[in-house]
Amino acid sequence: MLVRTVRISEIISSLKNDNYNVRRLGNYSGIKQGGPFNEPLGNPGATSVTFRHDSKKNITRAIRVPYGVIPTEETIQRMNKMSKLLRRRENGTNNFSLVPFDVIKSAVYIQDFEVPAIVMPWIEGKTLHELARNFARANNQKGLNLLMKGIEKLGKQFQLSAFDHGDISGGNIMIGEKGLLHIIDPDTLLHESITNPPLTEFGHVSYAHPNRNHIQWESDLYRFPLEVIVVSLMALSIKPSLVKIFGDDDNSILFVQDDLLKPQESKLFNYLCNHNCIISC
Protein backbone atom coordinates (compact mmCIF):
# COMPACT_ATOMS: atom_id res chain seq x y z
CA MET A 1 0.00 0.00 0.00
CA LEU A 2 1.32 3.43 -0.97
CA VAL A 3 2.19 5.55 2.05
CA ARG A 4 1.61 9.27 1.58
CA THR A 5 3.58 11.82 3.57
CA VAL A 6 3.28 15.59 3.83
CA ARG A 7 5.35 18.39 5.36
CA ILE A 8 4.05 21.37 7.32
CA SER A 9 5.57 23.70 4.71
CA GLU A 10 3.46 21.98 2.01
CA ILE A 11 0.29 22.45 4.08
CA ILE A 12 1.04 26.16 4.56
CA SER A 13 1.76 26.57 0.85
CA SER A 14 -1.56 24.95 -0.10
CA LEU A 15 -3.48 27.21 2.27
CA LYS A 16 -1.75 30.33 0.90
CA ASN A 17 -2.53 29.32 -2.68
CA ASP A 18 -6.19 28.38 -2.06
CA ASN A 19 -5.47 24.71 -2.70
CA TYR A 20 -7.86 23.56 -0.04
CA ASN A 21 -11.56 23.01 0.65
CA VAL A 22 -12.61 26.63 1.17
CA ARG A 23 -16.27 25.71 1.65
CA ARG A 24 -15.52 23.48 4.64
CA LEU A 25 -12.47 25.20 6.12
CA GLY A 26 -13.40 28.83 5.48
CA ASN A 27 -11.86 31.78 3.67
CA TYR A 28 -8.11 32.23 3.82
CA SER A 29 -8.54 35.71 5.32
CA GLY A 30 -9.88 34.08 8.49
CA ILE A 31 -6.78 31.96 9.08
CA LYS A 32 -4.48 33.58 11.61
CA GLN A 33 -1.36 34.80 9.84
CA GLY A 34 1.90 36.41 10.86
CA GLY A 35 5.56 37.11 10.19
CA PRO A 36 8.07 36.93 8.94
CA PHE A 37 6.34 36.05 5.65
CA ASN A 38 2.73 36.83 6.59
CA GLU A 39 1.71 33.20 6.19
CA PRO A 40 -0.59 30.90 8.20
CA LEU A 41 0.62 30.48 11.77
CA GLY A 42 0.50 26.81 12.64
CA ASN A 43 1.00 25.33 16.09
CA PRO A 44 2.73 21.98 15.47
CA GLY A 45 2.05 18.96 17.66
CA ALA A 46 3.48 15.46 17.45
CA THR A 47 1.42 14.41 14.42
CA SER A 48 -0.63 17.43 13.32
CA VAL A 49 -0.39 21.19 12.95
CA THR A 50 -3.23 23.41 14.19
CA PHE A 51 -4.37 26.68 12.64
CA ARG A 52 -6.78 29.21 14.14
CA HIS A 53 -9.66 30.34 11.92
CA ASP A 54 -11.84 33.35 12.75
CA SER A 55 -15.09 33.92 10.91
CA LYS A 56 -17.99 36.34 11.19
CA LYS A 57 -20.41 33.50 10.40
CA ASN A 58 -18.90 30.73 12.54
CA ILE A 59 -17.32 30.47 15.94
CA THR A 60 -13.54 30.64 16.10
CA ARG A 61 -12.31 27.20 15.12
CA ALA A 62 -9.18 25.08 15.31
CA ILE A 63 -8.18 23.38 12.06
CA ARG A 64 -5.92 20.37 12.70
CA VAL A 65 -4.09 19.04 9.65
CA PRO A 66 -1.94 15.90 9.96
CA TYR A 67 1.64 15.96 8.78
CA GLY A 68 4.12 13.15 8.29
CA VAL A 69 2.25 10.00 7.29
CA ILE A 70 -1.28 10.77 6.09
CA PRO A 71 -4.05 8.88 7.97
CA THR A 72 -5.48 5.84 6.21
CA GLU A 73 -9.06 5.49 5.04
CA GLU A 74 -9.68 3.18 8.01
CA THR A 75 -8.47 5.85 10.43
CA ILE A 76 -10.65 8.51 8.82
CA GLN A 77 -13.73 6.27 9.07
CA ARG A 78 -12.95 5.55 12.71
CA MET A 79 -12.65 9.26 13.50
CA ASN A 80 -15.96 9.91 11.75
CA LYS A 81 -17.63 7.35 14.02
CA MET A 82 -16.02 8.96 17.05
CA SER A 83 -17.24 12.38 15.95
CA LYS A 84 -20.84 11.12 15.75
CA LEU A 85 -20.60 9.50 19.18
CA LEU A 86 -19.34 12.71 20.72
CA ARG A 87 -22.21 14.64 19.18
CA ARG A 88 -24.69 12.28 20.81
CA ARG A 89 -23.22 12.96 24.26
CA GLU A 90 -23.71 9.33 25.27
CA ASN A 91 -23.54 8.04 28.83
CA GLY A 92 -23.38 11.43 30.49
CA THR A 93 -20.29 12.57 28.61
CA ASN A 94 -21.64 16.11 28.63
CA ASN A 95 -20.49 16.26 32.25
CA PHE A 96 -16.92 16.78 31.10
CA SER A 97 -15.49 18.38 28.04
CA LEU A 98 -14.39 16.13 25.23
CA VAL A 99 -14.39 18.81 22.57
CA PRO A 100 -16.62 17.79 19.61
CA PHE A 101 -15.10 17.79 16.15
CA ASP A 102 -15.86 17.25 12.46
CA VAL A 103 -13.72 15.25 10.07
CA ILE A 104 -13.10 16.76 6.62
CA LYS A 105 -11.85 13.92 4.43
CA SER A 106 -10.76 16.14 1.52
CA ALA A 107 -9.45 19.26 3.23
CA VAL A 108 -6.07 20.28 1.83
CA TYR A 109 -4.87 19.50 -1.69
CA ILE A 110 -1.18 18.70 -2.09
CA GLN A 111 0.12 17.61 -5.47
CA ASP A 112 -2.07 14.70 -6.60
CA PHE A 113 -3.58 13.72 -3.25
CA GLU A 114 -5.90 15.07 -0.57
CA VAL A 115 -5.13 15.53 3.11
CA PRO A 116 -7.90 15.26 5.74
CA ALA A 117 -8.42 17.69 8.60
CA ILE A 118 -10.23 17.87 11.91
CA VAL A 119 -12.22 21.02 12.66
CA MET A 120 -13.26 21.82 16.22
CA PRO A 121 -14.13 24.85 18.38
CA TRP A 122 -11.13 26.95 19.38
CA ILE A 123 -10.67 26.79 23.16
CA GLU A 124 -9.28 29.99 24.62
CA GLY A 125 -7.23 29.50 27.76
CA LYS A 126 -3.99 27.97 28.98
CA THR A 127 -2.75 24.41 28.90
CA LEU A 128 -2.76 22.52 32.18
CA HIS A 129 1.03 22.32 31.97
CA GLU A 130 1.43 26.10 31.60
CA LEU A 131 -1.15 27.03 34.21
CA ALA A 132 0.18 24.59 36.81
CA ARG A 133 3.72 25.93 36.55
CA ASN A 134 2.46 29.53 36.59
CA PHE A 135 0.43 28.81 39.74
CA ALA A 136 3.47 27.23 41.39
CA ARG A 137 5.66 30.24 40.62
CA ALA A 138 2.97 32.49 42.08
CA ASN A 139 2.73 30.25 45.17
CA ASN A 140 -0.96 29.73 44.37
CA GLN A 141 -1.55 26.58 46.38
CA LYS A 142 -5.33 26.94 46.24
CA GLY A 143 -5.27 27.09 42.44
CA LEU A 144 -3.04 24.02 42.26
CA ASN A 145 -5.32 22.11 44.61
CA LEU A 146 -8.35 22.99 42.47
CA LEU A 147 -6.52 21.79 39.36
CA MET A 148 -5.69 18.52 41.10
CA LYS A 149 -9.32 17.97 42.11
CA GLY A 150 -10.41 18.75 38.55
CA ILE A 151 -8.07 16.11 37.13
CA GLU A 152 -9.22 13.55 39.72
CA LYS A 153 -12.81 14.24 38.71
CA LEU A 154 -11.89 13.91 35.04
CA GLY A 155 -10.37 10.48 35.67
CA LYS A 156 -13.47 9.27 37.50
CA GLN A 157 -15.72 10.53 34.71
CA PHE A 158 -13.66 8.65 32.15
CA GLN A 159 -14.10 5.47 34.18
CA LEU A 160 -17.88 5.93 34.22
CA SER A 161 -18.20 6.81 30.54
CA ALA A 162 -17.80 4.76 27.39
CA PHE A 163 -14.92 7.00 26.34
CA ASP A 164 -11.22 6.85 27.14
CA HIS A 165 -8.13 8.62 25.86
CA GLY A 166 -4.77 7.22 24.85
CA ASP A 167 -2.55 10.29 25.11
CA ILE A 168 -3.42 12.50 28.08
CA SER A 169 -0.73 15.06 28.90
CA GLY A 170 -0.38 18.50 30.41
CA GLY A 171 -0.28 19.97 26.92
CA ASN A 172 -3.56 18.65 25.52
CA ILE A 173 -5.80 19.65 28.42
CA MET A 174 -6.88 23.27 28.17
CA ILE A 175 -8.23 25.24 31.12
CA GLY A 176 -10.87 27.51 29.64
CA GLU A 177 -13.45 29.92 30.99
CA LYS A 178 -14.55 29.39 34.59
CA GLY A 179 -11.79 26.84 35.05
CA LEU A 180 -13.42 24.20 32.84
CA LEU A 181 -11.18 21.40 31.53
CA HIS A 182 -11.18 20.68 27.81
CA ILE A 183 -9.37 17.78 26.13
CA ILE A 184 -8.32 19.20 22.78
CA ASP A 185 -6.58 16.18 21.21
CA PRO A 186 -9.07 13.70 19.69
CA ASP A 187 -6.50 11.63 17.76
CA THR A 188 -6.27 8.83 20.35
CA LEU A 189 -9.80 9.10 21.69
CA LEU A 190 -11.31 5.68 22.42
CA HIS A 191 -14.87 4.39 22.71
CA GLU A 192 -15.95 0.95 23.85
CA SER A 193 -18.14 0.47 20.76
CA ILE A 194 -15.33 1.13 18.26
CA THR A 195 -12.56 -1.35 17.50
CA ASN A 196 -9.23 0.02 18.63
CA PRO A 197 -6.73 0.82 15.87
CA PRO A 198 -3.17 -0.53 15.76
CA LEU A 199 -0.95 1.00 18.42
CA THR A 200 0.90 3.89 16.76
CA GLU A 201 1.27 6.53 19.49
CA PHE A 202 2.86 5.72 22.81
CA GLY A 203 1.95 8.90 24.65
CA HIS A 204 4.03 11.84 25.82
CA VAL A 205 7.33 10.70 27.31
CA SER A 206 6.87 12.89 30.41
CA TYR A 207 3.48 11.33 31.23
CA ALA A 208 3.13 7.88 29.65
CA HIS A 209 4.07 4.61 31.32
CA PRO A 210 7.45 3.34 29.99
CA ASN A 211 5.88 -0.03 29.07
CA ARG A 212 3.47 1.61 26.66
CA ASN A 213 5.76 0.72 23.76
CA HIS A 214 5.47 -2.99 24.57
CA ILE A 215 1.69 -3.37 24.85
CA GLN A 216 -1.53 -3.03 22.97
CA TRP A 217 -4.35 -0.76 24.15
CA GLU A 218 -4.70 -1.29 27.88
CA SER A 219 -6.91 0.92 30.01
CA ASP A 220 -4.83 0.87 33.19
CA LEU A 221 -1.65 2.06 31.50
CA TYR A 222 -3.62 4.61 29.51
CA ARG A 223 -4.81 6.13 32.78
CA PHE A 224 -1.25 6.27 34.10
CA PRO A 225 -0.70 9.84 32.76
CA LEU A 226 -3.62 11.05 34.88
CA GLU A 227 -1.87 9.63 37.95
CA VAL A 228 1.35 11.40 36.96
CA ILE A 229 -0.55 14.68 36.66
CA VAL A 230 -2.40 14.22 39.98
CA VAL A 231 0.83 13.46 41.87
CA SER A 232 2.56 16.44 40.23
CA LEU A 233 -0.25 18.83 41.16
CA MET A 234 -0.50 17.43 44.69
CA ALA A 235 3.23 17.87 45.26
CA LEU A 236 3.19 21.43 43.91
CA SER A 237 0.12 22.35 45.96
CA ILE A 238 2.05 21.33 49.08
CA LYS A 239 5.43 22.71 48.04
CA PRO A 240 5.19 25.11 45.07
CA SER A 241 8.94 25.78 45.11
CA LEU A 242 9.47 22.34 43.53
CA VAL A 243 8.76 24.07 40.21
CA LYS A 244 12.20 25.70 40.48
CA ILE A 245 13.94 22.32 40.69
CA PHE A 246 11.92 19.80 38.69
CA GLY A 247 10.10 19.70 35.36
CA ASP A 248 10.44 22.24 32.57
CA ASP A 249 8.34 24.86 30.83
CA ASP A 250 8.20 23.00 27.51
CA ASN A 251 7.36 19.38 28.25
CA SER A 252 6.50 18.53 31.85
CA ILE A 253 4.83 19.75 35.02
CA LEU A 254 7.29 17.94 37.32
CA PHE A 255 8.18 14.48 36.02
CA VAL A 256 10.45 14.09 32.98
CA GLN A 257 11.14 10.99 30.90
CA ASP A 258 14.12 9.82 32.96
CA ASP A 259 12.05 9.94 36.17
CA LEU A 260 9.57 7.47 34.69
CA LEU A 261 12.18 5.28 33.03
CA LYS A 262 14.43 4.97 36.10
CA PRO A 263 12.42 5.82 39.23
CA GLN A 264 15.06 4.21 41.45
CA GLU A 265 17.57 6.81 40.20
CA SER A 266 15.16 9.76 40.14
CA LYS A 267 15.84 12.70 42.45
CA LEU A 268 12.16 13.64 42.22
CA PHE A 269 10.94 10.17 43.24
CA ASN A 270 13.47 10.13 46.06
CA TYR A 271 12.25 13.51 47.30
CA LEU A 272 8.56 12.61 47.15
CA CYS A 273 9.08 9.25 48.86
CA ASN A 274 11.06 10.75 51.72
CA HIS A 275 9.32 14.06 52.32
CA ASN A 276 7.15 13.84 55.43
CA CYS A 277 4.59 16.39 54.29
CA ILE A 278 4.08 14.70 50.92
CA ILE A 279 3.75 11.25 52.48
CA SER A 280 1.29 12.33 55.17
CA CYS A 281 -0.94 13.98 52.60
Segments predicted by a language model, with ranges:
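Juxta-kinase regulatory segment immediately upstream of eukaryotic protein kinase catalytic domains
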Residues: 1-41, 78
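ATP-binding glycine-rich loop module of kinase domains
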Residues: 36-40, 46-99
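Conserved structural core of kinase catalytic domains
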Residues: 97-145, 196
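Catalytic-loop of the protein kinase fold
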Residues: 155-176
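Activation of the activation-loop gatekeeper triad in protein kinase-fold domains
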Residues: 185-190
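Conserved activation segment of eukaryotic-like protein kinases, specifically the C-terminal portion
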Residues: 197-212
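Conserved end of the kinase activation segment
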Residues: 211-221
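Helical subdomain adjoining the active site within ATP-dependent kinase catalytic cores
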Residues: 235-281
